Amino acid sequence: DRSVNKFKKLVPQQQEGYYMAVGPKGVVIAGRDERGLYYGVQTLRDMISKGQLETCTIQDWPDVKFRGAIEGFYGRPWSHEHRLRQIDFYGRNKMNVYIYGPKDDPYHRQHWREAYPENEAKLLQELNVRAHQRGVNFYWAIHPGLDIKWTNEDRDNLVNKLEKMYGLGIRSFAVFFDDISGEGSRGEK
């Protein structure tokens, strides 16, 4: 498109970068990639919400590749709605990672070998879709260290669980071995 090519040289070449110009004739936002364009829109939304839409040019990109949070704490668990709001917050603030690993999720930890019940699997799919819509990579984490046996059977159990999560549309994964003792902490095996 000729209108985008006109600004191509002004767009930062760093991943997730964008160029934005606000002038008397309108606003131009051009992203290095899809996420860069999304971030430019977030900057414009922020400026409008603060009533600060003034003539300007912005060339912006992240200095840190991974920006976000791990939900992997002990304590009062987040509700599904809270998780959705967190993902919205991450997207608005140009964070690109949300790692789902709450200690209260039994299928992430104590019952890691078992499949999620259908209703809970749908909630994870919803989180994953929302994250994608907000420019956030959704990582599903598994925490098998409490009772993993360093056997071919448990290796297969782990692979099978990850494949089930892949079947839900999830494409990024983490394997946690923190806060454990016993067999799971014996990495030499």
Tell me the role of every PLM-derived stretch.
Residues D1-V64, R134:
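Contiguous, structured surface segment used for ligand recognition
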Residues I70-K189:
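Aromatic-lined carbohydrate-binding surfaces of glycoside hydrolases
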